[in-house]
Amino acid sequence: MSDRQQVTNAKGERIAIVAGLRTPFAKQATAFHGVSALDMGKMVVNELLARSELDPKLIEQLVYGQVVQMPAAPNIAREIVLGTGMNVSTDAYSVTRACATSFQSTVNVAESIMTGNIDIGIAGGADSSSVLPIGVSKKLAHALVDLNKARSFGQKLQIFRRLGLKDLLPVPPAVAEYSTGLSMGQTAEQMAKTYNISRADQDALAHRSHTLASETWASGHLRDEVMVAHIPPYKQFIDRDNNIRENSVLESYAKLRPAFDKQHGTVTAANSTPLTDGASAIILMSEGRAKALGYQPIGYIKSYAFSAIDVWQDMLMGPSYATPLALKRAGMELEDLTLIEMHEAFAAQTLANMQMFASKKFAEEKLGRNRPIGEIDMSKFNVLGGSLAYGHPFAATGTRLITQVCRELKRRGGGTGLTTACAAGGLGVAMIVEVE
C-alpha cells in the first residue's frame, strides 16, 4: 500500500483553493473592541463572496470554527450562513482544534469534496479576545440554578446567604490547559530552557518577523488578501494589522521583562504573539468545478497531517511531528519545498521546532526515523514575517497561512509550500500546498 495521500475526488480532480481573504488582525481591545467573532466571520465571508463574484447560493457547505466560544451562538458556521445570503439549506457546522482550527475546517471541506458530497465549500475561523464569555464562580452558578427552584422568599434568602463577596466576582476564560494547569507561555518557557534557546535568539526571530511583515505591507503584497473592515457603527475602519512594529529595532526587545518566569525566564511579550482579534476564510472547489466556473485557483492541497503528543512536556512541538507525516504523504523531502510557513506562537516554540527538524536524535527517538526532517533554509522560512508580527486570532491563523503561502508562491512563479502549526492540547498540523 502506497504512503502517498491522494487529495483528489473520484474523478481524479484535485482540491482547488480558489480564493482566500482575512480581516486585518488587531490587538485585543483596539480596533475590533466590541466586535464578536461571529460578526468578523460574517464580515470576511461576505467580502470573500463579493470579491470572488461567486453566487452565495452555490456554496454547498461551510465549515467554520472559533476557539473562544460564544455561548449565545455556539454554531458560528450556521450563523454565518444565515447572515451572508447563502441558501438556508447550505450545510454548516463548527469545529475547534485550538490554534489549528481553520486547518481542520479546511480539511473537513476538502474531504467533503474528495468524497463527492459537494463541489464548493468555504472554510475558515474567527476569534475575538475582546468579546469574551465572562463566567461566574462555581458557587454562584450552583446558587443561580437553585434559585430557579426556590419558591419562597425565605428559600431564596437562604441561597444568597451561602455566597461570599468573592463568589460574586466574574471569572474570565481560562488561559491554561485544563489537564495540566499550564499556560502555553509556561510551556514555551519550558521549551526554551530544555533546548537552551537564548533570549537573544528569541528576540532576533521576533525582530525578523516584524521587519519582514512591515516590508511586506509596504510592498503592497497583502492588499488583495486583507480586506478593509468597517467597524459598527461604521464611523471607523481598519485596513491593516496593528501589531506590527514598524521600524523594529532589535535592541529595544531586550528592555522587556520576562512574562512567565519573572526571575529566570526569557519569554517576553515582545517575543510572543499577543491576544488578537480577526477572521479569515477560503473558498475550496473541485478542480473541475473551478475550471467550469472560470476560476484560476491560487493553489491546490497536496497533503495534510495532524499529530498529538503529551501535554506535560514540549506541548508546542506539533510541527515537528506533523511535518514528516505530511512530507511522506506528499512523497517529498523538506529540501523539495519552495517555501515554509510555520506559525510563530512564541519565538521559543518556533526555534525549538526548527532545532528538532534538524536533530537526528529527535528523529530516531521520537519519530522512528533514521534521518532528521532536515535543516530549515531561512531563505524559505516565513519570508513575509509570521504570527509574532501579524498576531494570532486562534481560529483564523490556519487559513491566513494557507492563503498567504499560496499567493506568495504564485508571485514567485509556483512551487510547493508547507504550512504548519502547533496547538494547545499537544496538537499539531501540517499541510502542503502546490501552486502552478
Swiss-Prot record:
Location in the cell: Cytoplasm
Superkingdom field: Bacteria
GO cellular component: cytosol
EC number in record: 2.3.1.16
Positions of the catalytic residues: C99 (acyl-thioester intermediate), H392 (proton acceptor), C422 (proton acceptor)
This protein's UniProt keywords: Acyltransferase, Cytoplasm, Fatty acid metabolism, Lipid degradation, Lipid metabolism, Transferase
Reactions the enzyme catalyzes: an acyl-CoA + acetyl-CoA = a 3-oxoacyl-CoA + CoA
GO molecular function terms attached to this record: acetyl-CoA C-acyltransferase activity
Enzyme kind, highest EC tier: transferase
Metabolic or biological pathway, per its Swiss-Prot or TrEMBL entry: Lipid metabolism; fatty acid beta-oxidation
Matching InterPro entries: Ac-CoA_C-AcTrfase_FadI (IPR012806), Thiolase (IPR002155), Thiolase-like (IPR016039), Thiolase_AS (IPR020610), Thiolase_C (IPR020617), Thiolase_CS (IPR020613), Thiolase_N (IPR020616)
One of the protein's GO biological processes: fatty acid beta-oxidation
Gene3D superfamilies: 3.40.47.10
Pfam family, one: Thiolase_N
Function: Catalyzes the final step of fatty acid oxidation in which acetyl-CoA is released and the CoA ester of a fatty acid two carbons shorter is formed.
NCBIfam families referenced in this protein's UniProt entry, alphabetically: AcCoA-C-Actrans (TIGR01930), FadI (TIGR02446), PRK08963.1 (NF006516)
Family of the protein in this entry: Belongs to the thiolase-like superfamily. Thiolase family.
Subunit (UniProt): Heterotetramer of two alpha chains (FadJ) and two beta chains (FadI).
Protein name: 3-ketoacyl-CoA thiolase
Organism: Shewanella sp. (strain W3-18-1)
Lineage: Bacteria, Pseudomonadati, Pseudomonadota, Gammaproteobacteria, Alteromonadales
